[in-house]
Amino acid sequence: MLKKRIIPCLDVKDGRVVKGINFVNLTDVGDPVDASKAYYEAGCDELVFLDITATHEERDTTIEMVRRVAEQVFIPFTVGGGIRTVEDMKRMLQAGADKVAVNSSALANPQLLADCAEKFGSQCVVLAVDAKKEADGSWHVYLAGGRKDSGRELLDWVQEAVGLGAGEILLTSMDKDGTKSGFDLPMLEAVSQVVSVPIIASGGAGSSQHILEVFEKTAATGALAASIFHYGQVSISETKKAMQAAGLEVRI
């Protein structure tokens, strides 16, 4: 059985962490290596870096950041944002990323998933999906940070993507994102019914109870959050103790 994973998410731009992190022991809150080490020491299981760097020219700073993190942090980490080609993924993996996440580029060109999985293995290929509930009760996949409806139905898209080679799904609920009201349990459960790959739940975490709940009530194997960890509102070690007490498989 897969151990349940707690996964902080860090937004990076120009090789620096943005959306401040309020760790008292950080000398440089914007340094991804410092932030990663602090999370590693706090007991997180994995990390996700979302690169919001706009232009291709600035990619080199991201590659350098990945290299620095890989040298000093010894837990798996995923990098997403701006990955459009097999070559983009290759550069991230060669720099030391364990997995690479693709979102809008996979929607625009689903063959990218198959090409990357064939070259590097499905275990490296993460499908990131932003989804929102529609009036008819279905969920649609959204683009542009949840502002544009792709027209794709969520359950259809995840099945197609896994069939092409995605080895994991990072599933963000745009309805829940930023609300701190808990994860979107019905959506997570619906997706887990149609695919067999690991699912990381994202969007809505506001407390350690929400993390416990998503693991007890859905098949998600990872819980991703940003601000509750960045600002020290939730202790990773305390959450893990609560998970262990609830009988969940967890790395302490």
From Swiss-Prot:
One example of a Gene Ontology biological process annotation: L-histidine biosynthetic process
Gene of this entry: hisF
Active-site positions on this chain: 11, 130
GO cellular component terms, semicolon-separated: cytoplasm
Similarity comment text for this entry: Belongs to the HisA/HisF family.
Keyword annotations from UniProtKB, A to Z: Amino-acid biosynthesis, Cytoplasm, Histidine biosynthesis, Lyase
Pfam families assigned to the protein according to its UniProt record, in alphabetical order: His_biosynth
Identification of the protein by name: Imidazole glycerol phosphate synthase subunit HisF
